[in-house]
Amino acid sequence: MSDFAYPLHEECGVFGIYDRAGTEDVAAAAYSALYALQHRGQESCGIAVNDDGVITGHRDLGLVNEVFTPEVLASLSTTTAHMATGHVRYATAGTRVRANAQPMIVRHGRGTMALCHNGNLTNAVELRRQLENEGAIFHGSSDTEVICYLITRNRLRMGSIETAISKTMDVLEGAYSLVIMSATKLIAVRDPRGYRPLCIGTLPGGGYVFASESCALDATGAALLRDVEPGEIVVVDTKTGELRSIKDHCGRPDTQMCVFEFIYFARPDSVIEGSSVHEARKQAGRFLAQEHPVEADVVIGVPDSGLDAALGYSQESGIPYGIGFIKNKYIGRTFIQGSQKQRENSVRIKLNVVSSTVKGKRVVLVDDSIVRGTTSARIIKLLRDAGAKEVHFRVSAPPFKYPCYFGTDIPDQKLLVATGRNVEQINEIIGADTLGYLSTEHVVQLAKNAKCGFCTACFTGEYAVEPESVLSTDIHDRHLNDRPKDAKKLGE
């Protein structure tokens, strides 16, 4: 879900539920699911409910528990509502506007639609320009609104919403996992390359759940059925209660699942494409120990996404695993903060070293990535200040050298510490004794059970979809100029 008003990208979480038995409070179920998906987006959230064909909703800036007070949640809860959708969103500073929050609800001549989107269109600028030339008026800066316009336009010309979605997919490029709710249908859609995860669950009393991750199914009592396949449209018709799959409407390019889902974004208790995220991260640690062995006394991980890889490194190397940091639970993830200054400030209060674990010891420190380098340097300094004799940094991903255009907040190349630098030069910046990255050869082997290929463009620069359209266009420049005057680019 990209923002034209700010040239960075975001990660989000989507959810949808249809309760056939009519025994669930679907608004409360969506609330629980969004709690489980909160790690995917912390700037805004929303829920839309379908009460006998009438769709209403609430969305705003803030965390799930901030936006959905007991009073707000009660206003959405009715005994006759059997469908709901939900969304959590992350975006960059300068785009924190309510208009970009989701679900987006569209009312048109043939009904109402609520839409949730995770991903980023690479041709959204061109599509938006075409729509504006045809008279469309946009209220926000999100490419999700482009998708809403296109589906609505096609719906007015076609006999069903799924046909309109299929027609819309013909012109969309890039990453999109969608959950869409109409008066009588709940629909899940995944782009043909399957960049972003999307799964299907079944409710005990009958009905279905769609979610970005299986951890949201667990939160609602649903059982994981399967993943939505790349290019697939899954339709739940509430008139029949049946689930229907549409697969023959688009081409079948090679799957490009974002490998960063396994490395960092997803919760470790989730299962994606048949593979446990927890096990995939442990496998990354085992590969790291094979590729970059070192003599040390203890292996520690950076909470939270570095812990599983550290455990794998310990198991493979035989070096004892230890708890090296205590994490402040009340501060967000540094990678998902609005500005570079916010990131730096949050590191200072986010982690505290368990000195008894590291004092006087040779430490293997495992983390999931190095993007800008500021967080890594600060963490290494914390360990040295606590008495660590040596710090050997191991990273469970290859170096980030290129920006992402498919829904991950990785900035342009000039802000990436690995751009134009080799491993030794990066290590000089972060201050470790040694530095080792996971190889691109092994990173695509993390999820052994996954029957899909992976996108590694942020490591290799090899994009399955050319990203030129999001880099330099008149409409992009115009929206940049129209952003709030107090909005600053990352790193300013």
Protein language model features and the residues they cover:
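Conserved short alpha-helical segments that host acidic/polar catalytic motifs at enzyme active sites
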Residues: M1-P230, V235-T238, E242-A296, V302, ...
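PRPP-dependent phosphoribosyltransferase catalytic core
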Residues: M169, T184, G221-D227, K381-E492
